[in-house]
């Protein structure tokens, strides 16, 4: 009887390939239109918080419309209906209702029923707007994921109605707002309009009911949306906001956001709103400052302006807005505001004689002012880079670099005004109290222990010459040490870091495995010896987190297998020799992106191929610019902006905290510290449990 395997032709035989051929033709490719794609993958255009982002896009458009005095409007009315739908109405110009001779679409369908459409992509003056919606997709995406949307436009003495069913334009039967009413699709509907009793009426009203099947895991937080609308109104002089509750069926709406707003406008009243919403005290005395400058975008030098209100308060409260958008993730504008404000106040406090300092006591530092400050900042910056369509943070590093010194100059001038002397004194004394509390854990107590712990530090206490030091250091300073992969990565860190609090040291290749080594044997390894001298906190039983020169130690390695090996060796070293630092939450692994997907100034950072593919799809859907994919072969090849945004910026980077796990201690010892026989046994055991039948070994 012949062996069945002998009947299989060799791989080089033509029959081998013919028998394994799979039909794959153009018919196998599924093509989706914009509505289908958005309904299938809503997070691509609207982020993870799908429903809140979608409704905010509609509200942003309305407020932006009436914020321009040339548009003839002043009021936005938000109505919460009992059926769960929301209406957003403005008394601005009213969307165009005529028909585009090229596409056959009317102006409403072009604006709210078409992705990547809007006046901001044209030569129209709206193209240089600092409004919230600049991607040309958000409001349309909101319509796409709705069960029904009715758009009513009043202009030219008439009222026009355009409906959308499940994202497509057309006509519903009946006069009630019923998403289940019979619907006829019509992409090229010509709007006739009916005469208004009041011919002077003008504006746009959008009533939208989201389709619950599209984003079942997303919930609409109407209180947060209304809070953002109130904030945007306060930053838009002349804009009035009215909220009407007709029996909202969701969670109870906070009464404060149901109140109408008719001024005053500015960051002063904005700070009141945000402190009240956060339940934190309102500062009784305040600094109100503003400024302007230029930062770098894809258009070249681009003007921006900012304004902020801040005052002494505990606990600290910060509220950051850019182009009227609330950015809970902060970003460049918030970093610049806090840095400029706190540094200017700290410099002023350093020259005060009546602060009440003890002999040889240092005054409060910038971080101490930041800890006792309530602040609201509003920045207007055309072409600003957002972290995503959800716009939770600003990622334009050049804005930070240009804005921080301008804030510092303005605050310095304000603080030098004799009329503000009492406010500066109060602020400085509150910051001094914060400084004393901060230093209590690191001052005399830490120094008193240093002598008894010194025997654990070795004899060579000089710092390695390749260490890139930070100006700040010591426990409680906020200083960070990056252990990076090689000199090339060090060069990138040097160009991108904030030298005030970020230090770096390059590792020569993979650090040695010193797990379980006697201390004298470990110190014979150059990398171990250098790290011990840099940290200055002792090792093993003598390791004291309070003596460490840095509050955080971060491993920065390439996003490849070699980088993973380096991180593994460092984690092993720290679990053995610096376990108290790990237990104190001071040790982290950075997650640099493997890919950067770009379209103009917008960038999305991706950890793997699946994130890359999703980002490419998102940018192609939201931008008419060419999409580029950059693969980062190593940290040294990243540009400074990307490195800052993804590895260095404390507000935007992704890091993983190293945590001790007692349940894995035995396995860790086997893999890193035990005899080779244990590792061979472990690998054989794992291999025996692999289902080889699922592997293609041909």
From Swiss-Prot:
One Pfam family per UniProt: HATPase_c
Cofactor note: Maximal DNA relaxation at 5.0 mM MgCl(2).
GO terms (BP aspect): DNA topological change
Region (Disordered): 443-473
Record key words, sorted: ATP-binding, Isomerase, Isopeptide bond, Nucleotide-binding, Topoisomerase, Ubl conjugation
One Gene Ontology molecular-function label: DNA binding
Cofactor: Mg(2+)
Cross-link Isoglutamyl lysine isopeptide (Lys-Gln) (interchain with Q-Cter in protein Pup), sequence positions: 429
Superkingdom of the source species: Bacteria
InterPro entries named in the record: DNA_gyrase_B_C, HATPase_C_sf, Ribosomal_Su5_D2-typ_SF, Ribsml_uS5_D2-typ_fold_subgr, Topo_IIA, Topo_IIA-like_dom_sf, Topo_IIA_B_C, Topo_IIA_bsu_dom2
Entry-linked PROSITE patterns: TOPOISOMERASE_II, TOPRIM
E.C. no: 5.6.2.2
The keyword RNA-binding is assigned to this record: no
Reactions the enzyme catalyzes: ATP-dependent breakage, passage and rejoining of double-stranded DNA
Regulation: Inhibited by quinolone antibiotic ciprofloxacin and coumarin antibiotic novobiocin, but at much higher concentrations than is usual for DNA gyrase/topoisomerase.
Residue intervals of the Toprim domain: 479-593
SMART domains from the UniProt entry: HATPase_c (SM00387), TOP2c (SM00433)
Family label: Belongs to the type II topoisomerase family.
Entry function: Catalyzes the relaxation of negatively supercoiled DNA in the presence of ATP or dATP but not other nucleotides. Individual subunits have no activity. Not able to negatively supercoil DNA, it can however introduce positive supercoils in DNA. Relaxes positive supercoils in an ATP-dependent manner. Catenates and decatenates DNA. Generates dsDNA breaks in the presence of the quinolone antibiotic ciprofloxacin, showing it is a topoisomerase.
PANTHER family reported in the protein's UniProt record: DNA GYRASE/TOPOISOMERASE SUBUNIT B, DNA TOPOISOMERASE (ATP-HYDROLYZING)
Subunit description: A complex of TopoN and TopoM, possibly a heterotetramer.
Listed name of the protein: Topoisomerase subunit TopoN
Gene that specifies this protein: topoN
